[in-house]
Design a protein with these regions (language model features):
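Conserved serine/cysteine hydrolase catalytic core
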Residues: 33, 217-288
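Conserved HGGG/HGGXW glycine-rich cap/lid loop of the alpha/beta-hydrolase fold
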Residues: 38, 42, 47-96, 316
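Flexible "cap/lid" loop of the alpha/beta hydrolase fold
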Residues: 139, 143, 152-183
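Conserved alpha/beta-hydrolase catalytic His-Asp/Glu region
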Residues: 183-245
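Catalytic active-site module of serine/aspartate enzymes centered on a nucleophile-bearing elbow/loop
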Residues: 280-323
Length: 323
């Protein structure tokens, strides 16, 4: 049914994709890890890209809320060229992985799923690199598995402030779901331009807009919206910043200074809204709280520096990785 729908939509100006991103191709071969979690048989899609000249190190890339393993495309190329093996999963609930209707989402659970994948691949020591929501997951993973993580890299992580404690109104999962059902390419594009790319726009960004919007045009729109709602509830209610002082791994904190991301900002009162997502301040505060942190700032970049200016970002990343 999904394939028939996608075939019918193939000639449209704007693509339609399945609930697991059927019809959208990543730049690298996608593999599947079958797992059982919470009495359900699920699958976790992932990329495992090996270098031609290995340096013996593995980096795990953890994507953000509106990103996928596939959006790490240029980062994977740079890292493998430098000798790193790269493992980039699509977390359960995202992109090409299972989207169960009933699932107790937590960063601990996503970390457990990721650990199971790495065990399956025989990977023991890793650098964990998390972007956006993936940064919150990377922190939780590092706290749960301190002996496995040799370095933590956080790229514009969200959750550097506790929105709920600051007074951002709580939304029910049903309210998040209703909000997500209204998602369009135009709304995605507007948000990404303002937040990810500091007001800039280039044609190459459109691919990632259509990747997301295509799932909302497809036959699994409601599944995708419901999964997104469950995930937003997890992000909003499960802060990790109160445990920053427990992080043992050396940490590279990379912050685009034009970022203004804050979950639930659209529902916040005006006087609070203008204070949220102050990344120049939040990055410095996080660097002070994380014991072995090194802060790298990108003055002109937004929430997605690895996409907005890949040359500048990857130079800083490769320089900051442990030798």
């Amino acid at each position: 049914m999904v394939l028939a729908f996608l075939a019918a939509a193939a000639g449209a100006d704007e693509p339609a994709y399945g609930p697991e991103l059927e019809g959208f191709d990543y730049a690298f071969p996608v593999q599947r890890f079958e797992l059982e979690s919470q009495r359900q048989k699920l699958h976790m899609s992932y990329l495992d890209v090996r270098p031609r000249a290995p340096n013996g190190r593995t980096i795990v890339l953890l994507h953000g809320k509106n990103f996928c393993a596939g959006t790490w495309e240029s980062t994977i190329r740079e890292l493998t060229q430098a000798g790193y093996r790269v493992v980039a999963p699509d977390q359960i609930g995202f992109c090409k992985s299972s989207k169960p209707e009933r699932y107790q989402y937590s960063f601990q659970q996503l970390a457990a799923n990721t650990r199971a994948l790495l065990d399956h691949l025989g990977v023991q020591r890793v650098t964990v690199l998390g972007h956006s929501t993936g940064g919150m997951l990377a922190v939780r993973y590092t706290l749960l598995h301190p002996q496995q993580v040799e370095q933590l890299v956080l790229v514009n992580p969200i959750g550097l402030e506790d929105w709920k404690a600051l007074g951002v109104p709580w939304r029910s999962v049903d309210d998040w779901h209703a909000r997500e059902l209204k998602t369009t390419a135009a709304s995605i594009r507007q948000y990404e331009q303002a937040t990810y790319y500091a007001g800039q726009w280039r044609p190459e960004y459109e691919r990632w807009v259509q990747m997301l919007a295509g799932m909302y045009r497809g036959p699994g729109k409601d599944v995708v919206a419901w999964s997104s709602a469950l995930l937003y509830d997890m992000i909003f209610t499960q802060p990790v910043l109160y445990e920053f002082d427990r992080i043992q791994a050396p940490t590279l904190l990379m912050i685009g200074q034009k970022d203004n991301t804050a979950i639930g900002k659209d529902a916040a009162p005006p006087e609070l809204k203008q204070k949220l997502g102050d990344y120049p301040r939040l990055g410095k505060e996080a660097a002070r709280r994380i014991p072995r942190a090194k802060l790298v700032e990108f003055p002109e970049l937004g929430h997605a520096p690895q996409i907005q200016d890949p040359v500048q970002f990857h130079q800083a990343l490769l320089k900051g990785l442990l030798r």
